[in-house]
């Protein structure tokens, strides 16, 4: 009875919410769509599949996600609905904060979990937004990743058998899971569990059950099978690295090349691994610059300068009498650099935010440098203190570098829009990381360092809303990459898929008159990485940044700001000279007397 009352109130809220919709909003179906879900559950006879029904309704609103389940389900199903709403909006290029999403799921008995329903829920959300019908007889299992991929799940044979009881004709599974292993557990007479593994060919099992089994890799593939509508976007022949982008980055790369090499030449007398590594990094960066990978080159020049500055400061520390005062002076130096970068950023933003990516990149780097400076006070090891201070100093300088990459857009994004979105994206990042953590619980420690979330919270508190948005996206992309690579033997196909999605998103932004410099630079950095996780994470991040930037500019206002501000990178004197141990005159006289006495004795 209570559930019926709640459902009545729930549906009444939908009606009221729709009554207040804007006149120019999209007309959405009152009843939404209903889609079958498959899950697995534990019974007295062991693991078995279960068929559920989900009703998905989308109304004009403010970005909220509501879920009504009976009985209460685990956090992973709730997380699946949040991801479904986010991905559906992303795929269709709509503003998620203009809609509210309602998921009504009836569960006959407790299920093991709900992540495998994510793909189907996303399909239903896309169908509800477009008023499309769901084909009868189609059932799907698979998680949904924030970058639109269908992820692997367990218990597929049991789910396939359950689907067969509901007149299913087509059963969709994640790519790479046509053949799966099932662990059977039987108890011996002595009460000992006996484990055996069976390999199941789902195509063969499907034939026995009269069902076609088919793989899908992306949500676009799944939507086509469920609705007949093809929303896949073809990769264009347009390059990611346009002449405008290369011309923008080249001067910065050349300036950093000169600065880092001058630093090395003035410090080469210090013979340690940091200096040797700095030279190697410069050589690698030169090669990248010659191949017009200017942003990737600047990243290596940056690392080189951090190494050299660390060596310089360590060398000077070793030769200082008052070492405590020297560390205090270094802290003051870094504080001054951070303040200079903050002042440049404030001046840059004084006329409004016209290039949100450049501002976001600068804000993120200033906040990171400030955070490191805070943490240094808790370190006891002097070498760690010096190396972290050197990194913080150079990281703060990169904010100034980014401001030189400004591209006038002729538009200003209102601060209240950025403030509102920063809180929303932080909430999304927290939800995604919690959701994905629930999927791999027991397989290791936390995916995302709590410090990453804390940093975003500090950015919002400080008014660095653009930086908070892009740092939240980085958390989301890192979290989603973890699940994408789970149990994947050869990640190359998924990496290529992520790269292609990023390429499409970047060129879509350009088609709207936006130059997504940050997104392209992230993509470029991903190209030089070799670690599969890091590479895929960068491509996923690049795509999210490009799409989010496009969304933010949809709220921009016209501006007369078309002239690039006069911003230059300050030239910093990094030269040091070898320090020789000073001897007192008396000491030198004693040495001379000893030499004379030795000579006289030899003559005798």
Predicted regions and their residues:
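Bacterial N-terminal signal peptides that target proteins for export
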Residues: 1-6, 584-585
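Sec-dependent N-terminal signal peptides
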Residues: 5-14, 592-595
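Long, charged/polar, soluble alpha-helical segments
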Residues: 207-209, 216-585, 599
